[in-house]
């Protein structure tokens, strides 16, 4: 990996991490912390955005298929933004707290909705780009 690529990932990861921190905290304060809603929202929205970005790259190419876009947005920004490791830890903590149903819901719903969000983002771009100019 080049120095330039490392810097792109670093800066993107910093921005994505700050975005995750604020959005997750905001959602947690608004909805409550009885369930890890902040992490849930971040994971689903991050999945949607990465699907949208991949769709733009596949449909339009150009800047969306460049190494810079991939390193900064896909690896850095979205890698710093999404919180799969936090999701896993919170699922285990729910189990350890005796909240097996909430843990199972978190695991199943997050996996299902994140996959659907990627497909929706990707499919949405494919559909929008089919519109006559």
From Swiss-Prot:
NCBIfam families xrefs: PRK14233.1
User: Can you cite an annotated GO cellular component?
Assistant: plasma membrane
Q: List the disulfide bonds.
A: none
Q: Pfam families of this UniProt entry? A: CRCB
The task this protein performs is described as: Fluoride-specific ion channel. Important for reducing fluoride concentration in the cell, thus reducing its toxicity.
Q: Which family, according to the similarity comment? A: Belongs to the fluoride channel Fluc/FEX (TC 1.A.43) family.
Membrane topology field: Multi-pass membrane protein
According to UniProt, the name of this protein is Fluoride-specific ion channel FluC 4
For this UniProt record, give its keywords in alphabetical order, as a comma-separated list. Cell inner membrane, Cell membrane, Ion channel, Ion transport, Membrane, Metal-binding, Sodium, Transmembrane, Transmembrane helix, Transport
Q: Which GO MF term does the entry hold, naming one?
A: metal ion binding
Q: Which species expresses this protein natively?
A: Brucella abortus biovar 1 (strain 9-941)
Q: Binding positions for Na(+)?
A: 79, 82
At the top level, the lineage of the source is Bacteria
Q: Where are the transmembrane segments?
A: 7-27, 37-57, 60-80, 107-127
The subcellular location is: Cell inner membrane
Control of this protein's activity: Na(+) is not transported, but it plays an essential structural role and its presence is essential for fluoride channel function.
Catalysed reaction(s) here are: fluoride(in) = fluoride(out)
Q: Which GO terms describe its biological process?
A: cellular detoxification of fluoride
């Amino acid at each position: 990996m080049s120095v330039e690529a490392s810097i792109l990932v670093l800066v993107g990861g910093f921005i994505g991490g700050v975005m995750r921190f604020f959005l997750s905290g905001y959602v947690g304060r608004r909805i409550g912390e009885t369930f890890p809603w902040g992490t849930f929202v971040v994971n689903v929205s991050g999945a949607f955005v990465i699907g949208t970005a991949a769709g733009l790259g596949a449909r339009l190419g150009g800047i969306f298929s460049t190494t810079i876009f991939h390193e900064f947005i896909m690896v850095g920004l979205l890698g710093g933004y999404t919180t799969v490791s936090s999701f896993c830890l919170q699922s285990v903590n729910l189990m350890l707290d005796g909240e097996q149903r909430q843990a199972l819901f978190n695991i199943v719903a997050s996996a299902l909705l994140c996959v659907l969000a990627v497909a929706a983002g990707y499919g949405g771009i494919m559909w929008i780009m089919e519109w006559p100019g």
